[in-house]
From Swiss-Prot:
Keywords: Ribonucleoprotein, Ribosomal protein, RNA-binding, rRNA-binding. GO terms for biological process: ribosomal large subunit assembly; translation. One of its GO terms (molecular function) is rRNA binding. The lineage of its organism: Bacteria, Bacillati, Cyanobacteriota, Cyanophyceae, Nostocales. Binds directly to 23S ribosomal RNA and is necessary for the in vitro assembly process of the 50S ribosomal subunit. It is not involved in the protein synthesizing functions of that subunit. It comes from the Bacteria. HAMAP family: Ribosomal_bL20. It comes from Trichormus variabilis (strain ATCC 29413 / PCC 7937) (Anabaena variabilis). The gene is rplT. It holds the Pfam family Ribosomal_L20. One of its GO terms (cellular component) is ribonucleoprotein complex. This is Large ribosomal subunit protein bL20.
């Protein structure tokens, strides 16, 4: 069996990790072992936080909608429930943007929800 020399492969693998670790502080960007650990940790955190970002934004939208709804005498759950009854299909992101950027339009939506209540 012939001998396999893997110097190039090993160097490329290590350089790939060190390239990903660029910008880390201290030995985390220069020494392969510590850089490898930090890159793995960073990739895990990035994956986890991409999922978490969706939850965080939904919480933010709900908080904004709730604050705007209470100015019109409704709670968040009443507003959402009444919008479903009135068959108004605005998602939470759009409602939150209306509440922040165009409060008058949000007021009209809230009025429609109040009418659907009774």
């Amino acid at each position: 069996m012939t001998r396999v020399k893997r110097g190039n492969v090993a160097r490329k693998r290590r350089n790939k990790i060190l390239k990903l670790a660029k910008g880390f502080r201290g030995s985390h960007s220069t020494l392969f072992r510590t850089a490898n650990q930090q890159v793995m940790k960073a990739l895990r955190s990035a994956y986890r936080d991409r999922k978490k970002k969706k939850r965080d934004f939904r919480r933010l939208w709900i908080t904004r909608i709730n604050a705007a709804a209470r100015q019109h005498g409704l709670s968040y759950s009443q507003l959402i429930g009444n919008l479903k009854k009135a068959d108004i299909q605005l998602n939470r992101k759009m409602l939150a943007q209306l509440a922040v950027l165009d409060p008058a339009s949000f007021g009209k939506v809230a009025e429609l929800a109040i009418q659907a209540k009774g």
